[in-house]
């Protein structure tokens, strides 16, 4: 039976949802820009003391902006372009190639019954999110 990309994406969504996996892309460039801009304006308005105050306020504002907004990994998976889904598909099928299944429901049941397979797929998914999407992964308990 040909393996469908959609089936594998559903499987990865199920596993990551079960573990409450979230990811956040940090916007460090935007935070640095805000920090510098506020420090610059503070320096123009208040001279050296204004620069110090502007730098402190800008730094706090920049830090707040870069504390990423977490999105559920299943949502991220489903929003990936087809080429990225294909990458995930290729990596996941290498892990589950020995399983025999007929549809996404059966595949999910087989994987959910194996802690070892779940760990391998979660590690692969966390690695993908961290390296390819440059995001921070978090698990809610």
From Swiss-Prot:
It is found in: Mitochondrion; Mitochondrion membrane; Endoplasmic reticulum; Cytoplasm, Cytosol. Keywords: Cytoplasm, Endoplasmic reticulum, Membrane, Mitochondrion, Transmembrane, Transmembrane helix. Disulfide bonds: none annotated. The keyword Ligase does not apply. The chain crosses the membrane at residues 37-57. It comes from the Eukaryota. Pfam families: C19orf12. Its main location: mitochondrion. One of its GO terms (cellular component) is endoplasmic reticulum. It is a single-pass membrane protein. Belongs to the C19orf12 family. This is Protein C19orf12 homolog. It comes from Bos taurus (Bovine). The lineage of its organism: Eukaryota, Metazoa, Chordata, Craniata, Vertebrata.
